[in-house]
Amino acid sequence: MSIAEDVTQLVGNTPLVRLRRVTEGALADVVAKLESFNPANSVKDRIGVAMIDTAEEAGLIKPDTVILEPTSGNTGIALAMVCAARGYHCVLTMPETMSIERRMLLRAYGAELILTPGADGMSGAIAKAEELAKSDKRYFIPQQFENPANPAIHAATTAEEVWRDTDGKVDIFVSGIGTGGTITGVARIIKERRPATQFVAVEPAASPVLSGGQKGPHPIQGIGAGFVPSVLVLDLVDEIVTVGNEEALDLARRLAKEEGLLVGISAGAAVCAALHVARRPENTGKLIVVVLPDFGERYLSTMLFADLAN
């Protein structure tokens, strides 16, 4: 029999699908990795399970431990799912600018949510989590931006899936940068096997910190944290592409209407960057894999679908 012991065993092995109708002018073949097929509908399910597994194995979590994490939403949802399945209490700090759907999902999983000022971005959520942790020794912070289990799980799973499903023929890998765990983990494995594979990082044009610019507010939830995360290894990144807010929003809407892929704003940004790269003459005939991090249903109240409310 093939029966999972709990929901955390269902994470990973997400599919690739070829993009066909939003790819006008593309000279390369663009395929999307649909991370919404994870049980809590995002790429962060991978690290949610991995960080708790690693902490349990190291004896850092006890029955009365409270899992505390600063999150822009998806990691919190993943951790809330894992905590619900394993019986831990979960407290999450999150910028108040994150969508109402994300807040409701977190609470639906039984998590306690503490909102921080939107102007402070993820730095504010991190500071609040650190403040809380000092007040009670029961708190354990997985800290996705620093935890080596983050890129490690992408090396162990995401990279292997991409390699397997493309028969090792991936030429270019495109990923938005939140923590940087996805691109770092995947690049570590695939560059060893196929050094010519290029890795493209995506960040908001309104907050181009990785490109050497200044942080700023933007609506592309999940990427562009406003600082360079310690788990991100920039030496593994071949190019950084910035994407405008409207470009990301437009592409995300088109993916739903033209490809049948209901995705979030950061997926729109990632595909926008992938198409930018795919239109270059030197990439003719190449295979581009782009990560679509989550499901669009958790953005229905945002500007992404604002025109549908009536």
From Swiss-Prot:
EC code: 2.5.1.47
Recorded coiled-coil stretches: none
PANTHER family on file: CYSTATHIONINE BETA-SYNTHASE
Quaternary structure and interacting proteins, as annotated: Homodimer.
Record's protein name: O-acetylserine sulfhydrylase
NCBIfam families found in the cross-reference section: cysK (TIGR01139), cysKM (TIGR01136)
Annotated pyridoxal 5'-phosphate binding sites: 74, 178-182, 266
Pathway(s) it belongs to: Amino-acid biosynthesis; L-cysteine biosynthesis; L-cysteine from L-serine: step 2/2
Its biological purpose: Catalyzes the conversion of O-acetylserine (OAS) to cysteine through the elimination of acetate and addition of hydrogen sulfide.
Primary enzyme class: transferase
Keyword Plastid: no
N6-(pyridoxal phosphate)lysine: residues bearing it: 44
Family statement: Belongs to the cysteine synthase/cystathionine beta-synthase family.
Highest taxon of the lineage: Bacteria
Gene Ontology molecular function, alphabetical: cysteine synthase activity
Xref: InterPro entries: Cys_synth, Cys_Synth/Cystath_Beta-Synth, CysK, P-phosphate_BS, TrpB-like_PALP, TrpB-like_PALP_sf
Native organism: Mycobacterium leprae (strain TN)
Needed cofactors: pyridoxal 5'-phosphate
Keywords noted in UniProt: Amino-acid biosynthesis, Cysteine biosynthesis, Pyridoxal phosphate, Transferase
